Amino acid sequence: IMGASLTTASAYIADISTPEKKAQNFGLIGAAFGLGFILGPVIGGFLGQYGSRVPFYAASLFTFINLIYGYFVLPESLKKENRRSFDIKRANPIGTLLSLKRYPLIWGLLICIVLFNIAQHSKHSTWSFFVIENFGWDEKLVGYSLGFIGLLAAIVQGGLIRLIIPKLGKVKSLYLGMTFYIAGLFLFSIADKGWMVFAFAIPLSLGGLCGPALQGIMTNNIPDNEQGEFQGGITSLISLTSIVGPLIMTNLFYFFTNNKGAIYFPGAPFLLAAIISTLGLIVAVNFLNKSNLKT
């Protein structure tokens, strides 16, 4: 119910950014998530020694500070005359999802988002299981690996993206990011030594180029006063993939790691994700080559 922060942040970025800067600015959201993955476990682990509930109190305090800052300090992104009036009929998940049908120009990219986010659950849903099963890691090493990936995400989306997208453009950056992501997923599927996790995390993290580039292309083709609703539709779409993705990836991992399976292959979810992402890349290339989108 309270999961609209990312949607609102994305809409805010779209409102205040010029078309040329949208993709780079969307990358800042990814960079913030990366820093969160680094700092969050450290803070939580430190506070946890004072009681299992203390990290939750701290998280509530941070959220409250965020609320105060947003309400009293952060300026409104649109002038009053440019805002659309509130309509209760459109303020529901189904209506928001159905609102995406008003944007046929970007349907191909929406398919790409669905495929890409299903593929992401190869790591979101099975990461701990994968590294523990495949490399015999303990909780500490799992945490280190997540922190390392968070650091790479912050570097890519907070820094590299500001160099690469202006130089290559959003479309080529999208293709480049998806290619790196596919390569990273495939490499993880065949990884059999612990050090490979840190090496293969580099191309996987460079895949972070594609998300902001994709967001930048789509938002450039949406009216300014519909950015919030559009971002809500995207979030609803991603939420649906968060139902399907974990079911597929966790069951696949179980099938290829339990004693009854004919083949032992803990990297199976990553291989499937590489195939799904390849389909997403094919869809994106074919669609963008035929469309007249503003990029």
Annotate each language-model stretch with its function:
Residues 67-73, 271-295:
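Multi-pass alpha-helical transporter architecture, strongest
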Residues 29-72:
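Helix-loop-helix hairpin linking two adjacent transmembrane segments in secondary transporters
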Residues 48-61, 251-277:
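A membrane-interface helix-boundary motif in multi-pass transporters
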Residues 171-214:
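C-terminal transmembrane helical hairpin of 12-TM major facilitator-type secondary transporters
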Residues 75-112, 133-134:
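Juxtamembrane intracellular "pre-TM" segments in multi-pass secondary transporters
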Residues 1-34:
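Cytoplasmic helix-loop-helix junction between adjacent transmembrane helices
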Residues 125-142:
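Short amphipathic helix-loop junctions that connect adjacent transmembrane helices
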Residues 156-170:
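Helix-to-loop junctions at the C-terminal end of transmembrane segments
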